[in-house]
């Protein structure tokens, strides 16, 4: 149902990915994330082709966090920002973060040593169905990926 990966460069850190579909409260989740009451990144699953994208973005975010050189204020936002091919934070949040209309949401959180995330509490806030991460290809919309990443059709393949 989920993917949890220990980061090679930071073995004390684990990244967990949770995928949801048929989400009915994306607007509420977004609001909670902006208030800081959700401990994780809320990502538009329609624009993610492979979980590896998330792991790369999370690894970079943790690295910059440890160096004190993040470009955003929170680790969760830094992960979303690192998914973007450009350097505009607000544009990255619009394209890769969730919006009120999203029905597929990927939640990503980082646990660092003693800092644990209460996954049950996080999952209970989502009004939708948690699905295995292997379902991501069915959720990905390649037309949206091409649009947000400014790619040509032949550049996006599975």
From Swiss-Prot:
**Keywords of this protein's UniProt record, alphabetized?**
Cytoplasm, Nucleus, tRNA processing
For the keyword Cytoplasm, the answer is yes
Q: Which terms under GO biological process does the entry name?
A: tRNA threonylcarbamoyladenosine modification
InterPro entries noted in UniProt: CGI121/TPRKB, CGI121/TPRKB_sf
A single GO cellular-component term from the record reads: EKC/KEOPS complex
Looking up SUPFAM superfamilies in the UniProt record yields: PF0523-like (SSF143870)
**Main subcellular localisation:** cytoplasm
The cross-references to Pfam families, in alphabetical order and at most eight, read:
CGI-121
MF terms from GO for this chain are:
protein kinase binding
The cellular location(s) given in this protein's UniProt record come to:
Cytoplasm, Cytosol; Nucleus
PANTHER family found in the cross-reference section:
CGI-121 FAMILY MEMBER, EKC_KEOPS COMPLEX SUBUNIT TPRKB
Q: Which family does it belong to?
A: Belongs to the CGI121/TPRKB family.
Subunit description:
Component of the EKC/KEOPS complex composed of at least GON7, TP53RK, TPRKB, OSGEP and LAGE3; the whole complex dimerizes. Interacts with TP53RK/PRPK.
What protein is this chain from? EKC/KEOPS complex subunit Tprkb
Q: Which species is this record about? A: Rattus norvegicus
User: Which taxonomic lineage does the organism of this UniProt entry have?
Assistant: Eukaryota, Metazoa, Chordata, Craniata, Vertebrata
Quote the gene name from the UniProt entry.
Tprkb
């Amino acid at each position: 149902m989920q993917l949890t990966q220990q980061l090679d460069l930071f073995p004390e850190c684990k990244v967990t990915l949770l995928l949801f579909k048929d989400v009915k409260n994306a607007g509420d989740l977004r609001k909670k994330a902006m208030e800081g009451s959700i401990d994780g990144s809320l990502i538009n699953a329609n624009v993610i082709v492979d979980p590896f994208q998330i792991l790369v973005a999370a690894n970079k975010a943790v690295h910059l966090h440890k160096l004190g050189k993040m470009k955003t204020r929170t680790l969760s936002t830094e992960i979303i920002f690192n998914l973007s091919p450009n350097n505009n934070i607000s544009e990255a949040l619009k394209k890769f973060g969730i919006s009120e209309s999203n029905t597929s949401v990927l939640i990503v959180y980082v646990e660092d040593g003693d800092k644990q995330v209460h996954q049950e509490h996080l999952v209970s806030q989502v009004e939708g169905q948690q699905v295995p991460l292997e379902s991501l290809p069915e959720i990905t919309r390649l037309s949206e990926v091409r649009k947000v990443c400014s790619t040509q059709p032949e550049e996006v393949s599975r």
